[in-house]
Curated annotation (Swiss-Prot):
Species whose genome carries this gene: Bartonella bacilliformis (strain ATCC 35685 / KC583 / Herrer 020/F12,63)
Protein encoded by which gene: rplJ
Name of the featured protein: Large ribosomal subunit protein uL10
CDD domains xref list: Ribosomal_L10 (cd05797)
Cross-referenced NCBIfam families: PRK00099.1-1
Family: Belongs to the universal ribosomal protein uL10 family.
Length: 172
């Protein structure tokens, strides 16, 4: 990478650190190419991305961002998993790390909040934004359905009484 490419990469990475809902930093030493591709595809399907960057460039890109406090995590072979949804990157990274011990979560950030390994794991256990939306819609629609059933019930009872009365009249 020449100087201009490095400068462009640092600018791009700085933008990622500023705009991402969450960033997870992990060691990937020992992962095979197919395992790394699998991680990239899983995070990509969930709406995030994975990037391997030189530690010095990542530290430069962190300067002036809300996530600057996580600069000390960039030692050794590190990768960055990030997503707009604050839950996606931690959830996929932690799930992948459970299945593959070569991926070691170091920490991360969510906006200005620096996250420890335990905080990243806690964040991963939360439902995603889409799951929360689905639960909210379910909670909102359930009372409406019940109200409709309550309103329909008296009319149904009247119809059954009239039907029973009609059958009684036919039998007589």
């Amino acid at each position: 990478m020449n100087r201009a490419e490095k400068r462009e990469f640092v600018t791009w990475l700085n933008k990622i650190f500023q705009e991402s809902g969450s960033v997870v930093v992990a060691h990937y030493s020992g992962l095979t190419v197919s395992q790394m591709s699998d991680l990239r595809s899983k995070i990509g399907e969930a709406g995030g991305a994975v990037k391997v960057a030189k530690n010095t460039l990542a530290k430069i890109a962190l300067q002036g961002t809300k996530s600057e406090s996580m600069a000390n995590l960039f030692t050794g072979q590190t990768l960055i998993a990030y997503s707009e949804d604050p839950i996606v990157a931690p959830k996929v990274a932690v799930d992948f790390a459970k299945a593959n011990d070569k991926l070691v979560i170091l920490g991360g950030s969510m906006g200005a909040v620096s996250l420890s390994v335990d905080a990243v794991k806690s964040l991963a256990s939360l439902p995603s934004l889409n799951e929360l939306r689905a639960k909210l819609v379910g909670m909102i629609s359930t009372p409406a359905t019940r109200v409709a059933q309550v309103i329909k019930a008296p009319a149904g009872q009247v119809a059954r009484v009239i039907g029973a009365y009609a059958q009684k009249g036919e039998a007589a």
